[in-house]
């Protein structure tokens, strides 16, 4: 009975419509949406076991090119993730420079490295191999392997 009196008073003051609108908004907000799982439980799980500790033997290939045309074969070996030592001592200087430019571009494009081991001898390494040359830094810092000027 007291609820009816309050409803009538709220109706006279104009509050009843606001209460109904608030209730409708709450009801609209609580509308449940059907959620579909990203992975259904009915699908078969394809677990693939991959060995993390694989013993892959690194292969080093030593090449002494006779012409510039062998540059493509050398870079194909680098693409196959092999370490290549290239000896260009028998090539003319201009041809050796062209070969070196080609190999340098290929190693850069593949993320590898090209280092000079000795005069006219280079090592091409893929991105998975780190080449350090500590001997070269020692030579630069001490101006020779043996420091005779003490």
From Swiss-Prot:
It comes from the Bacteria. Gene3D superfamilies: SepF-like protein. It is found in: Cytoplasm. Keywords: Cell cycle, Cell division, Cytoplasm, Septation. One of its GO terms (cellular component) is cytoplasm. GO terms for biological process: division septum assembly; FtsZ-dependent cytokinesis. InterPro entries: Cell_div_SepF, Cell_div_SepF/SepF-rel, SepF-like_sf. Cell division protein that is part of the divisome complex and is recruited early to the Z-ring. Probably stimulates Z-ring formation, perhaps through the cross-linking of FtsZ protofilaments. Its function overlaps with FtsA. Belongs to the SepF family. Homodimer. Interacts with FtsZ. This is Cell division protein SepF. The lineage of its organism: Bacteria, Bacillati, Bacillota, Clostridia, Eubacteriales.
